[in-house]
């Protein structure tokens, strides 16, 4: 009988999607041992099977979620399923755009794939972790793999510098999280998020506020929110571009999932305090991220500051704390996956053909490569929030949710900074399209001839076409996508409790 009860409480089926990722890690490491030629052939196939199986198992869990597993340390509720699916998809696209880049850099493919899958495993586990210990293990799994990926180009001093900076700042963030967790454990005597939330309701104190600040600092680091963003531009510029693409979506999505769960569960009695702090972070991120992006000359640094601003937009939905706001958050992160990775696909293709990352070198690109120009233009317009792109509808849902919840200042600043972002996105597009042939950059003048045939497309081109198509046409499906996001929120018990409490208070 005790063994049966233990098995029921374990609910190991909750982590079947992560188990497939783990099998993929083992498989890629084994083929890597067989030699680079074998790894180049089989590592991509193993990754596709691993991620595809994980996504399929997540789809099966959608109608039968597990709301408590591993003695309450992990939840595979609908919200966790949605975030884990976004992360798995971002990994799939990131790997598609990385194979050619990794081969050209002379790096081992099997080893690279294993580290990317390890980061994915940590990110997916973080989305459903409901215990301070499981959160820390997931955070560190994601973080250590991210450090390795940032410094993967061992012969490139910029990559090594990026990895060292990321390691130092990330280690400090982990230490801050542990310090805050020790306060929470000392106040409650438990490591379970829900139990801690119940225990500290009647214990408002300086220590509790300090724990909130420490935990929020860790969240801000993971989502690259101002003023915890300093690592982002340098790491993005120095790291391999496919790694930057993954970190900008997969790692950030895991950070937002972590934020929603711990703030809504553990600090539900400090609702006003953490929402005020989150509002400040959102305003600073939207303002600084988009304003500083105006002055960038590197495409990767511009996208780095753009991602900081995008984090500020997503925070509007979390601060609103309503059904529509949280649903808009899920929808926008799904949209961000395609429009951001689509932009990075174009940047990688351009850098592989030219070796350049400078924005000025894109001058006149339309004359030599109209398809990259079109793809990058559509993705940048979507990031700026122009209709009828998918990003426009994502932002509209966020702004409507914020306005309905009386977050007027946040929405107004969001609208103003969106206009600023449109300016620097359109500046890049104008440079690619408007320049006359004689005004094209020297890089573009010597641009190689391109065959854009459909037959035998390499993975990078498949990823580019898919992301651009979803970005451009996804606006048509924005309503069904929002309904899916709404289901993820409405079918998640802990969120419904929080939303009901907020409605009663209002």
From Swiss-Prot:
- InterPro entries in the cross-refs: NADH-Q_OxRdtase_suN/2 (IPR010096), ND/Mrp_TM (IPR001750)
User: Where are its TM segments located?
Assistant: 14-34, 42-62, 79-99, 108-128, 132-152, 167-187, 206-226, 240-260, 276-296, 302-322, 330-350, 374-394, 409-429
Top-rank taxon of the source lineage equals Bacteria
The cysteines joined by S-S bonds are none
Swiss-Prot/TrEMBL keywords:
Membrane, NAD, NADP, Plastoquinone, Quinone, Thylakoid, Translocase, Transmembrane, Transmembrane helix, Transport
Q: What is its EC number?
A: 7.1.1.-
A Pfam family per the record: Proton_antipo_M
Q: Please state what class of enzyme this protein is.
A: translocase
Q: How does it sit in the membrane?
A: Multi-pass membrane protein
What's a GO biological-process term for it? ATP synthesis coupled electron transport
- Enumerate the catalysed reactions: a plastoquinone + NADH + (n+1) H(+)(in) = a plastoquinol + NAD(+) + n H(+)(out); a plastoquinone + NADPH + (n+1) H(+)(in) = a plastoquinol + NADP(+) + n H(+)(out)
Q: Which GO terms describe its molecular function?
A: NADH dehydrogenase (ubiquinone) activity; quinone binding
Q: GO CC terms on record? A: plasma membrane-derived thylakoid membrane
Subunit structure of this entry?
Answer: NDH-1 can be composed of about 15 different subunits; different subcomplexes with different compositions have been identified which probably have different functions.
Q: What is this protein called?
A: NAD(P)H-quinone oxidoreductase subunit 2
Protein species of origin: Prochlorococcus marinus (strain MIT 9312)
């Amino acid at each position: 009988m005790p063994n049966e009860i233990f098995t029921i409480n374990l609910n190991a089926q909750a982590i079947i999607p992560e188990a497939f990722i783990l099998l993929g890690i083992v498989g890629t490491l084994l083929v890597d041992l067989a030699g680079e030629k074998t790894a180049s052939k089989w590592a991509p196939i193993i990754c596709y099977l691993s991620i595809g199986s994980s996504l399929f198992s997540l789809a099966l869990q959608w109608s039968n979620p597990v709301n408590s597993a591993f003695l309450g340390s992990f939840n595979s509720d609908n919200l966790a399923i949605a975030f884990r699916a976004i992360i798995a998809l971002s990994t799939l696209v990131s790997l598609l755009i990385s194979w050619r880049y990794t081969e050209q850099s002379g790096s081992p493919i099997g080893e690279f794939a294993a580290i990317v899958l390890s980061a994915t495993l940590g990110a997916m586990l973080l989305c459903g972790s409901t215990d301070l210990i499981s959160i820390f293990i997931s955070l560190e799994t994601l973080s250590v793999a991210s450090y390795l990926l940032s410094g993967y180009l061992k012969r490139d001093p910029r990559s090594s510098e990026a990895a060292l900076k990321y390691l130092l700042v990330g280690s400090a963030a982990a230490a801050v999280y542990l310090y805050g967790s020790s306060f929470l454990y000392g106040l409650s005597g438990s490591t379970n998020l829900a139990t801690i939330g119940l225990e500290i309701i009647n214990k408002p104190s300086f220590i509790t506020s300090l724990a909130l600040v420490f935990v929020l600092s860790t969240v801000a680091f993971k989502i690259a929110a101002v003023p915890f963003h300093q690592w982002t531009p340098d790491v993005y510029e120095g790291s391999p571009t496919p790694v930057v693409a993954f970190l900008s979506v997969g790692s950030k999505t895991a950070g937002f999932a972590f934020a929603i769960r711990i703030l809504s569960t553990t600090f539900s009695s400090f609702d006003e305090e953490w929402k005020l702090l989150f509002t400040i972070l959102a305003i600073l991120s939207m303002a600084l991220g988009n304003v500083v992006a105006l002055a960038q000359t590197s495409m990767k640094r511009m996208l780095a500051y753009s991602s900081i601003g995008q984090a500020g937009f997503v925070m509007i939905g979390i601060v609103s704390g309503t059904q529509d706001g949280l649903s808009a958050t899920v929808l926008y992160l799904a949209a961000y996956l395609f429009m951001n990775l689509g932009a990075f696909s174009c940047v990688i293709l351009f850098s592989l053909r030219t070796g350049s990352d400078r924005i000025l070198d894109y001058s006149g690109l339309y004359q030599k490569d109209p398809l990259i120009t079109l793809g990058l233009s559509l993705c940048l317009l979507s990031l700026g929030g122009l209709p009828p792109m998918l990003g426009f509808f994502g932002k509209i849902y966020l702004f409507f949710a914020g306005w309905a919840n009386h977050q007027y200042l946040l929405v107004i600043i969001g609208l103003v900074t969106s206009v600023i972002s449109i300016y620097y996105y359109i500046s890049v597009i104008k440079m690619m399209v408007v320049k006359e042939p004689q005004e094209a950059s020297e890089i573009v003048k010597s641009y190689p001839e391109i065959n854009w045939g459909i037959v035998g497309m390499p993975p990078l081109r498949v990823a580019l076409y898919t992301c651009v198509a979803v970005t451009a046409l996804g606006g048509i499906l924005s309503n069904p996508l929002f309904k899916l996001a709404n289901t993820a929120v409405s079918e998640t018990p802990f969120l419904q409790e929080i939303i009901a409490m907020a409605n009663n208070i209002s």
